[in-house]
Amino acid sequence: MRWPCSSRFRGLWPEAAPWAVLLALGVPGWVLAVSATVAAVVPEQHVSSAGQAPLDWLLTDRGPFHRAQEYADFMERYRQGFTTRYRIYREFARWKVNNLALERKDFFSLPLPLAPEFVRNIRLLGRRPNLQQVTENLIKKYGTHFLLSATLGGEESLTIFVDKRKLSRKSETLGGVPVVGGTGNSSAVSLETLHQLAASYFIDRESTLRRLHHIQIATGAIKVTETRTGPLGCSNYDNLDSVSSVLVQSPENKVQLLGLQVLLPEHLRERFVAAALSYITCSSEGELVCRENDCWCKCSPTFPECNCPDADIQAMEDSLLQIQDSWATHNRQFEESEEFQTLLKRLPSDRFLNSTAISQYWTMDANLQHRYQQLGASLKVLLKKMHRIVRRLFNLCKRCHRQPRFRLPKERSLSFWWNRIQSLLYCGESTFPGTFLEQSHSCTCPYDQSSCQGPIPCALGEGPACAHCASDNTTRCGSCNPGYVLAQGLCRPEVAESLENFLGLETDLQDLELKYLLQKRDSRIEVHSIFISNDMRLGSWFDPSWRKRMLLTLKSNKYKPGLVHVMLALSLQICLTKNSTLEPVMAIYVNPFGGSHSESWFMPVNEGSFPDWERTNVDAAAQCQNWTITLGNRWKTFFETVHVYLRSRIKSLDDSSNETIYYEPLEMTDPSKNLGYMKINTLQVFGYSLPFDPDAIRDLILQLDYPYTQGSQDSALLQLIELRDRVNQLSPPGKVRLDLFSCLLRHRLKLANNEVGRIQSSLRAFNSKLPNPVEYETGKLCS
């Protein structure tokens, strides 16, 4: 006799088997129950119908549930398309079966009437049997449990299998057409109708079945099955609704089993429990071991893979492969959907669409957004199911020699779909479209396709992108943005023309060459200038104490206004009388392009990285030295006038620290107390002169107000910006560059202040429109 799976077990550990085998107890003259053995379960393979979700997680060998008739009926209906089941049932019980042998032992304290063969097998085990002996002599012959009590009864049920797709189509077709039953009542064919009919089955059975059969014939969307079961002659159902009926749902009316170890001697009980658990859990292929909340089978040498259920693992791996196929199918259906194809047709073809432009069209399409959300919901369900299977798969493979083989699909991001649209637009000239690469504006074609790239329109945008595509050929630019010029269908940065006609700024004089020429005092790098001073004359001795500060001026351009000069070095030859304690101190002011003395900048000698004076002896007898400060190519600057303020200080030796100290001399009224005399032989500026055409620059400025074409105005602005930057680049060192360009306009072109301001504003406005504009702050030098 086989008992239902809802039976209750007592006596074994919680890891006991989900079903049990009943023990035969012999009583003199009669048999209480017959023994049963475990039947080998044959796995049933099911294949789900096309277009429906697989049920492989149910199809492996998991016990008697898969051999039940109810499960077989469900799978059969599922293959036919009925995805939903409604079932209403009631159970009844009338006969209670108890183990009389146990009652006899409990009430009368009599020994159990065990079968002689069972007792003989116990004695054959001895005092310390191994698990294999217990399994062979007891478990395989008598099972693991025996019957304690049970309730016998039956069941009456009504099962309705529903195909929701057919039901919804029939409802839309019929609309409000009534479904007439035997009683004349009418209602729409819907799930609510089925709910009401199922609920009224036990109240009015005949009428309910008649109406359900009518719906089944009319729609074909449901299958109705009526089941009545009951053991031991329970074929009379007339009084099922009477008060004497007992429902099996009550807790006391379940099958109760007791572990067989309670019948064994004390020394065999623990070994029997271990053998029973190993037999049930490990299928006699190993020994069950439990440690630290984890149990596994210690495999015997004959079955080294007893912990590795290959059939279950293979079934789960197959399920993961099917989910991957479903994942790819969902993505393909989204790409082939009406919403996606509609977006492709709406995209403009007269210009190139980058990812940002496609994302804007994507965001504005509400229907596509809704369809994309549906795709995400479907993939989320698949991913959740896949994670669940993967967790179970890793648990099963925890003690396997091989690791599971699977690949988790990744959800495609929005950027993937935007690139997919680009690929369909620009790489679809073959059977299978290639992959578009936005960085290189090219296509990567499939290996079996020689070419898949179609015409790619020009890209519109700022900077080097096109302002408009050509009307006759959309792959080429028709016009460009400010700061760029059209060349062979492409926009290239517009470069200012050469400034040689206005101001020659190029030189190839290197620092080593300059240093060599300065040592030789080469006249080829000397800038001719006029020496002016009211305090002294060149080549004459003078008393430095006569004035506290003397002004020496070198002025160029007095007779050559068509040149501007660049200073690379400044040199003075200073002579002192013998035993003189005076030391010359010079402050240098440079005026770049003329104007008042206040429009000069101070030279920061020996401050930061700025060079210091270099002194070389010329005449030891007269104590003459060349004082030279070399600016080089790094610190070179424009000059028109150089002002040298000469002071003197007294050099002395500190006896305490053995260091040289300087202090200012006092004004001497007595000539006999003179501290020495000084003589300046030469004052020279070394550098080079640049050709300068003020009239050409004025003509260039006139094009800002009276352009011949827009291109000529842009070209003039570019040249003026280039000239401004090149001039200001020779600004003296400091935190902020000085605005030498305004000084050039003000003093060499003789422009008014408001005219200079207007030109600077025009240059700043045009420069802001150029690609990668470079703006820098400048300090005011000229008023």
Swiss-Prot record:
Q: Name one GO cellular component term.
A: cytoplasm
Q: Which UniProt keywords apply?
A: Cell cycle, Glycoprotein, Growth arrest, Secreted, Signal
Glycosylation site residues? 185, 354, 473, 579, 626, 658
Name the InterPro entries for this protein: BRINP, MACPF
Q: Does the keyword field hold Transferase?
A: no
Indicate the secretion signal residues: 1-33
All copies of domain MACPF, residue ranges: 85-281
List localization entries.
Answer: Secreted
Location, primary (coarse class):
secreted
Annotated tissue distribution: Expressed in olfactory bulb, cerebellum and neuronal layers in hippocampus.
- Enumerate the Gene Ontology biological process terms: cellular response to retinoic acid; central nervous system neuron differentiation; locomotion; multicellular organism growth; negative regulation of cell cycle; negative regulation of mitotic cell cycle; nervous system development; positive regulation of neuron differentiation
- This protein's source sits in the domain of life called Eukaryota
Q: Which family does it belong to?
A: Belongs to the BRINP family.
What is known about what this protein does? Inhibits neuronal cell proliferation by negative regulation of the cell cycle transition.
Q: What is this protein called?
A: BMP/retinoic acid-inducible neural-specific protein 2
